[in-house]
Amino acid sequence: MTKMMKAAVFYGKHNVKVEEVPVPEVKENEVLIKVAYCGVCGTDVHIYEGDKGCAEVHPPKILGHEFSGVIVELGKGVTNRTVGDRVTVDPNVLCDSCPACLSAKGHFCEHMTGIGTMVNGGFAEYVAVPVKQTHLVNAKTELIKAAMTEPLACCLHGIDMCNITAGDSVAVIGAGMIGLIMVQLARISGAGYIAVIEPVETKRKSALALGADEAFSPAEISEDELKAKNFNCVIECAGLIKTIEQAVRIAGNKATVMMFGLTKPDDAVSLKPYDLFVKELTLKTSYINPYTQARALKLIESGRVDVSSMVQPAIKLEELAEVLASAEKRAKGKFVVAL
C-alpha cells in the first residue's frame, strides 16, 4: 500500500490546498527527510501571487525551500548520512558540470533544479532530496533555527558583495527578517555605524536590539539628514521601487548600493545616471546562495546571528494559504510552518 502524507499543494495563482499525497520514493543518491519546519519566503509569496520567483513553477507543486528535519530513509547509494541525522537543506541543486559550475559560479548553473520551486519542497510532512544538498545540524541547535539557514545563506552572499570594511557606515532600509539579518552581518563585517530606516516601531526596536546604532522612521528624518551621514554602503531590503530609489539618493560618495529586496519582475525604477556619476556609486544585486549554506549554519549554531527573535509562533500547514494571502499578517514577522 502506498504511504501517504499531508502536503500543501500549489495549483496556481491564489490556489494552495492541503491534501493527502504519496510519500516520495527515494532515489539512489537521495535521502527522505521528515520535515520539522519550513519557512515562508518572499519568493513563495511571489509564486502564490502569480509572479515569477527565482525559478519557473509549473503546478501542481509543493512549495517551500527553507526547511529542516530528520533523515528517515537512505537511498541505496548514500554512505555519508544515517537515519536519525538532523539536517537542513540547500534547495538549489547544481549540475556540477556546466561552465558556470566549473568556474565557481554555481548560482548561474545552466541546469539548476530548485527544491520547492521546480520540484516538490518542504511544505509537506516528507521530502526527498539529493544527499549532497543536506547539511548536518548539531544536537544543540533547534531545528526551527536550522530552517533559517537558507535565508541567512542568501544574506551572506549579499553582504560579501557589499565589501564592508572596518569602521564603515552602513544603512539598512527595511527591518523585516532579511533586514535584521543584514544588520547583524554588517556588524560582524566590521561596520562602525549602522542605521536602519523602517516605518514600523516594533521592527525599529528589534533592529536596535540586534546591533543597529540608530533606527529611524522615514517620516521622522529627512533625506538630507540621511545623506549627511555619508553612508559607505546602503542595503535595500524592502524590495520596493521607492526604497530602491531612496537608497541611491542617500548613499555617500563612492558608496555601494546593494539592491537585495526582490521586486516584481516588471517593476522599473527611475534613476538619474548623473547622480550615480557624480558620486561614483556602485550598484549591486545579489542572487540566491552560492556556496554560503555551510557558513550560514555555522553562524546559527554558534549563536553569532540571531534568527529566532523575529520569527512568529509556528503555524500549521492549514494556515499557510492565509499567510501567503495576507500582507498584513506577514508584516508581523517571519512565519514558519511546523510539520
Residue locations for each model-derived region?
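Short glycine-centered segments of the SAM/dcSAM-binding site in methyltransferase folds
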Residues: R86, S169, A255-T256, T282
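Glycine-rich beta-strand-centered segment in the early N-terminal region that forms part
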Residues: P22-C38, K52-P99, N138-T141
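N-terminal glycine-rich cofactor-binding segment
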Residues: V9-E25, G42-E73, T88, G106-N120
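C-terminal hydrophobic helical "lid"/dimerization subdomain
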Residues: T2-K3, E245-R249, P290-L339
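Conserved beta-strand positions in the Rossmann-like core of class I SAM-dependent methyltransferases
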Residues: I194-A195, M258, K284
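Glycine-rich cofactor phosphate-binding loops and adjacent beta1-alpha1 units
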Residues: C162, K205-E280
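NAD(P)H dinucleotide-binding glycine-rich loop of Rossmann-like/cofactor-binding domains
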Residues: C95-I173
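Mid-domain Rossmann-like dinucleotide-binding core that forms the NAD(H)/NADP(H) cofactor-binding site
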Residues: T141-E220
